[in-house]
Amino acid sequence: MYTIFFMLRGFFFFITLLVLFSCSHKKYENPHVRIQTDFGNIEVELYPSKAPKSVAAFLSYVDSGLYKNSSFYRVLKEENQPSSSFKSELIQGGIWQTNSKKALTLPGIPHETTKESGLLHINGTISLARTTPGSASSEFFICVGDQPAYDYGNTANADKLGYAAFGKVVKGMEVVNMIHQQPENGEAFSPPIAINDIVRM
């Protein structure tokens, strides 16, 4: 009787330790987020050690629920850009179409160049949209194919400071490609593609 009792006590102690270890063990080395759309989910790994300010700001928006019922609203394809411009391919999203008043109140994120971060605009890179350096906030884009023009020192901006890359799609690139092929009017998705939410994993 006592033998069974001690065996059971030891078993439950082991299970408790296992559960505690599982809870304390991080699932990922870097934070991951899931972009939820009707076309499927896009999993993105973020790089806080390389682009700490960009990642911190983006995660603060994710945690606050800012991206709930937002959208992908802009698309660049080779065929929808003027023949005189450099060609790039991407999808851009955020709250600009769904809550532009809120977007205008958000503080700018200090610009982290790809020269500083070491990140490049390759297929699946997520990066902050901006006008002038330090003006980026809630809006972001995902590269479809390699886009070196968006890196530091290249031609996407007159200031040649590039855009602030801060993560990469690690699962669901087929969803990005599917969204990229949806109908557009000029550079605008028609209709916009709903982002149901962006959540931490």
Residue ranges and their predicted role:
Residues 1-29:
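Bacterial Sec-dependent N-terminal signal peptides
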